[in-house]
């Protein structure tokens, strides 16, 4: 099963052989966010929302026929887990205006069997169901840097914390061993990076399975019989896959993958193949399989690239520069093709969201488009606070240190000015979500070094953002940004808010927003647009009525890209498209 978009919205398709034709299975009016196969069956579940509101509903479906909705309208449903035999499904549910989460369990073939089995305040999500259907493994999220693992006994309703003495640890991707006596998870215990561990349920003691790694384990999978282990390492942004036999403890032949980024992987039921998705800088996400004996690496799909010419795609260059305090910051640089070595190109600094995110060398249609169509050099920095470089680096922008990441962009502007093929007088900043906040903040600090800014659904005031973001995510965001109810943090927010410094924004601004955004509400964009316009600064504002936090529908994305192109051409003083020579 693959998710792809041929029409206006992403839907689920089926591919039965490498290079085979895709058969569409879902026909929803809204984009389908993703699908998960139900073990041991020819069925799957998928999730979708309405207009980008992120109140996700879960549907069970076969390869033909109408899907069955398993969830109640008006609720947010996530974190789907199955028992090994596929006869039980679990997920967590949140409701509007409440920070309470509930875990639901039932038979995926019978919506009437689903019932609530546990609830508490704060974010929780199932990870796995035991083979005997007696227990649910779930994670309680404290923040993006801390979580706890629990086993829920379905008969008694009692919970048991796993490794209660571990301290402040982030656990991710947890799953039960087949005998339920241990748990596999990615853990930050006693490490700056996420390591793969096996935790004994009774004692809480863990065994580190990847003790020597200096990078994060990003995901892993284990065969149904708990014999084969495959895990992926985020090595300076690139995914590297390792496969091991857990019984003999020996490493198997390792797949030589194209340099890119992997998100998910899974062993086939007969354990002969490992399936995974892979996205590279010059190819959109595709599905591959690798024979565990090391014989063959097979590409199943070849995704289309729209109107982009594969021959003209840019391979990003990894660069590093020093920031104001000596901290090294990395960035990916996409340079346009066919540009003379001494020609100074305009620059777009594209700052990722999160802030606990990372720009990686996966398919980036925006960077490729701006390099190919605008002839711009696109720089994507991983400022402090980014993940992928250890917990210490990720914590460098917390709370009162928020603007240190903005200073990293000041250092990047210095680096740009020192490059012989970059035009320091034609630099724009671009970002979405938290990157939108960064775009606004950079515009208040470095307006004299920019020609303008593009920001999409960015935070303009942390205090109003925390007040108005959906209740189910508010405490998690407070753990990252700080608590607006604390007078000390309230003073920090007042000082650093782009809205409070809007008079310093003196260059043209393009703002885009989804009307149904539950994360960064439309009010954040409304207020900053009003503030900039009140000062007489040119401000373009585009609101999509049927989108949320991100734009998923093709007509809306086509319009977004066209507006951005017109706006940036104006900033860069490009009256017509860049020619083959790279000159106007």
Language-model segments: which ranges?
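Conserved beta-propeller blade repeats
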Residues: 1-3, 29-47, 58, 74-95, ...
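Beta-propeller blade-edge and WD-like acidic-aromatic loop motif
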Residues: 4-24, 43, 49-69, 88, ...
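Hydrophobic/aromatic anchor residues within beta-strands of the central parallel beta-sheet
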Residues: 12, 149, 196, 331, ...
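Short, solvent-exposed loop/turn and secondary-structure capping segments
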Residues: 55-57, 102, 148, 195, ...
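Cap/lid segment of the alpha/beta-hydrolase catalytic domain
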Residues: 138, 294-296, 301-434, 438, ...
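Flexible loop/turn segments at secondary-structure boundaries
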Residues: 146, 169, 191-194, 216-217, ...
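Extracellular/periplasmic ectodomains of large secreted or surface enzymes and adhesion receptors
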Residues: 180, 198-212, 219-232, 242-255, ...
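Active-site-proximal cap/loop segments of hydrolase catalytic domains
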Residues: 380-584
């Amino acid at each position: 099963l693959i998710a792809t978009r041929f029409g206006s919205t992403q839907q689920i398709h089926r591919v039965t052989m490498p290079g085979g034709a895709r058969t569409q299975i879902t026909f929803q009016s809204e984009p389908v966010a993703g699908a998960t196969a139900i073990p041991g069956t020819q069925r799957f579940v998928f999730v979708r929302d309405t207009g980008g509101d992120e109140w996700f509903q879960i549907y069970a479906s076969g390869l033909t026929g109408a899907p069955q909705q398993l969830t109640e309208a008006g609720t947010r449903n996530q974190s789907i887990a199955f028992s090994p035999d596929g006869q039980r499904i679990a997920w967590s549910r949140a409701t509007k205006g409440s920070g309470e989460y509930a875990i639901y369990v039932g038979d995926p073939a019978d919506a009437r069997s689903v019932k609530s089995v546990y609830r508490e305040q704060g974010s929780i999500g199932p990870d796995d169901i035991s083979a005997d259907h007696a227990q649910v493994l779930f994670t309680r999220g404290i923040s993006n840097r801390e979580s706890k693992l629990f086993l829920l006994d379905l008969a008694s309703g009692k919970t048991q914390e796993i490794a209660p003495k571990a301290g402040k640890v982030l656990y991710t991707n947890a799953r039960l061993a087949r005998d339920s006596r241990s748990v596999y998870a990615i853990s930050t215990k006693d490490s700056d990076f996420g390591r793969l561990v096996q935790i004994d349920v009774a004692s809480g003691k863990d065994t580190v399975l990847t003790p020597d790694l200096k990078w994060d384990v990003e995901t892993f999978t284990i065969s149904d019989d708990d014999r084969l282990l495959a895990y992926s390492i985020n090595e300076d942004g690139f995914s590297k896959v390792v496969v091991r036999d857990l019984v003999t403890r020996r490493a198997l032949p390792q797949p030589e993958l194209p340099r890119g980024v992997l998100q998910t992987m899974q062993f086939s039921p007969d354990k002969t193949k490992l399936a995974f998705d892979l996205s590279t800088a010059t190819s959109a996400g595709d599905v591959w399989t690798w024979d565990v004996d090391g014989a063959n690496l097979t590409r199943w799909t070849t995704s289309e690239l729209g109107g982009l010419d594969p021959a003209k795609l840019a391979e990003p260059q990894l660069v590093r520069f020093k920031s104001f305090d000596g901290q090294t910051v990395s960035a990916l640089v996409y340079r346009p093709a066919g540009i003379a070595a001494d020609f100074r190109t305009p620059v777009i600094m594209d700052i990722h969201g999160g802030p606990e995110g990372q720009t990686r060398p996966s398919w980036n249609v925006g960077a490729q488009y701006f390099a190919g169509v605008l002839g711009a050099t696109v720089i994507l920095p991983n400022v402090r606070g980014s993940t992928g470089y250890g917990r210490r680096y990720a914590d460098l922008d917390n709370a009162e240190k928020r603007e240190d990441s903005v200073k990293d962009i000041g250092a990047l502007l210095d680096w740009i000015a020192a490059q012989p093929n970059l035009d320091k007088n034609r630099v724009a900043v671009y970002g979405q979500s938290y990157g939108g906040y960064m775009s606004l903040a950079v515009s208040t600090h470095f307006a004299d070094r920019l020609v303008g800014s593009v920001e999409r659904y960015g935070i303009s005031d942390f205090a109003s953002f925390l007040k108005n973001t959906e209740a189910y995510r508010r405490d998690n965001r407070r753990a990252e940004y700080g608590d607006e109810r604390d007078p000390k943090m309230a003073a920090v927010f007042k000082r650093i808010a782009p809205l409070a410094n809007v008079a310093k924004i003196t260059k043209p601004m393009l703002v885009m927003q989804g009307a149904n955004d539950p994360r960064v509400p439309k009010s954040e964009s409304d207020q900053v647009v009003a503030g900039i316009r009140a000062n007489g600064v040119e401000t373009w504002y585009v609101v999509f009525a049927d989108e949320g936090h991100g734009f998923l529908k093709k007509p809306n994305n086509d319009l977004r890209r066209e507006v951005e192109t017109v706006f940036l051409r104006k900033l860069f003083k490009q009256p017509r498209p860049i020619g083959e020579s790279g000159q106007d």
